[in-house]
């Protein structure tokens, strides 16, 4: 019914990354050359986000220009300042009559326990990632960023640079994760899932049930169950910090904001299939859903919302798998980066 394709084959959006490998943090910008209608689902108890009300059905129906994913927890929200500056410099944004205001949504992961907690995504890093996305879109030929047409790197890049999983017993028993991408096509219909996996829980293959990454034993020689570890803490305690899985579903099919909110919530099923435990008060789990279909286009792609939502969950499940499988590093390297 549908086939996997390279995200490079899709021109309705472009990705830009900025990564600080030494500090263990970064930014990913999803830029929409023609804007996008967007929805959002927030299921975690501790989200760090910016301008998510733009995705709500009761707010003005203006297309967003970019979605930003980053590290840095709430500090990382500063990255959108640089994204807005970059877009404004290229005359991209909502025309208020007095000025152009780029419409940018953002969500962050908590990666302050990996690398340096004093170095967080800032305006300059957001600007760099946005410039890379604009260069891929052919809007700028600036040499201030590196960009080519090769397959985008997955794993420890952009917002996934400092992502980790299986942290219920602390970082010494956790494991590296990162950013994953999965794109599919059915006729003229396309869908892409992008995710940064930074979960409290373990990560599983949604098809086989195999544990792919997560909580390890104290000597790091074997995996142990994060769910079983959680059950040791029946009494309330403030110990579960440093998590959040954030992502986006992007399609060229035409949907309104209410429908995209539903698609985002259906895509959340991927988190339940692949992550356990998930959606805790220590997670800020968020999924955006965006449609790049042009408003009023008589030739826009139309598909059933149930088809789109179900496929979104499958694509997100595959992206989660790609995120952890492309982020494997040695125990020695991992332990050198944690507090």
Predicted segments — roles?
Residues 1-339:
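Alpha/propeptide regions of enzymes that mature by internal proteolysis
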């Amino acid at each position: 019914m549908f086939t996997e394709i390279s995200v490079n084959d899709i021109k309705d959006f472009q990705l830009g990354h900025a990564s600080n490998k030494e500090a263990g943090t970064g930014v990913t910008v999803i830029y929409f050359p023609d804007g996008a209608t967007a929805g959002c689902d927030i299921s975690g108890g501790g989200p760090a986000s910016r301008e998510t009300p733009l995705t709500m059905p009761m707010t003005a129906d203006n297309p967003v220009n970019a979605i930003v994913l980053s590290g840095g927890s709430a500090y990382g929200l500063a990255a959108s300042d640089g994204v807005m500056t970059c877009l404004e410099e290229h005359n991209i944004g909502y025309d208020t009559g007095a000025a152009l205001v780029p419409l940018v949504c953002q969500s962050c992961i908590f990666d302050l326990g990996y690398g340096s907690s004093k170095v967080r995504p800032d305006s300059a890093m957001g600007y760099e990632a946005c410039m890379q996305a604009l260069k891929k879109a052919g809007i700028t030929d600036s040499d201030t960023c590196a960009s080519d047409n090769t397959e985008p790197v997955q794993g420890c890049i952009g917002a996934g640079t400092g992502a980790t999983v299986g942290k219920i017993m602390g970082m010494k028993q956790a494991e590296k994760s990162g950013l994953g991408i999965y794109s599919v096509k059915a006729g003229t219909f396309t869908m892409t899932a992008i995710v940064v996996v930074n979960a409290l829980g373990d990560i599983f293959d949604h098809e086989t049930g195999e544990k792919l990454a997560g909580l390890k034993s104290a000597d790091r020689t074997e995996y142990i169950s994060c769910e079983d570890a959680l059950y040791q803490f029946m009494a309330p305690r403030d110990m579960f910090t440093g998590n959040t899985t954030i992502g986006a579903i992007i399609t060229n099919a035409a949907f309104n904001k209410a429908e995209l909110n539903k698609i985002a919530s259906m895509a959340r099923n991927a988190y339940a299939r692949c992550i356990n435990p998930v959606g805790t008060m220590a997670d800020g789990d968020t999924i955006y859903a965006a449609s790049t279909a042009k408003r009023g286009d008589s030739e826009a792609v139309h598909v059933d919302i149930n088809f789109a939502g179900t496929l979104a969950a499958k694509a997100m499940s595959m992206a989660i798998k790609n995120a952890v499988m492309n982020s494997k590093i040695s125990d020695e390297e991992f332990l050198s980066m944690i507090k």
